[in-house]
Amino acid sequence: MKIRIAEYCGFCYGVKRAVDMAYKLAEANEASGTLGPLIHNPQLIEDLNTKGVPCRESLDEFQAGETVVFRSHGVGPDVYEAAHAKNLTILDATCPNVKAAQKKGQALAEAGYLPVIIGEKNHPEVKSIVQWAGKHAIVIERIKDIGNV
């Protein structure tokens, strides 16, 4: 059997950036962890864990002075506030494209618009965009749901 590898394969630039940031942190040997899985890749998450950057599910699992890595999917503004209040160092690995969507959603909401986000409402990336856009943002998961807006 012949196996061909696509010319362009591997992580997208946002994920590559997040992964590189996490491995540099591992090399620095600082007390740290990611808040939730950095990316959707269990093997990489386990490798980071063995290198001293474990996946943690809550800010409650961090001690003051530790570094928290925000996942590539982003987090809401309340998480930034809670991390600052806990005196954590933030390493923001949010994908630049996600960060741009968060800012756009926030700007639209602040300008009085109703942000409509198309995606899976329970996906971490969509959740983070909704949190920046405010509680009145709408998520559409299926085309048939558009008529309900």
Q: Which residue ranges define each predicted feature?
A:
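The feature marks the mature, well-folded catalytic cores of soluble enzymes
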Residues: M1-V149
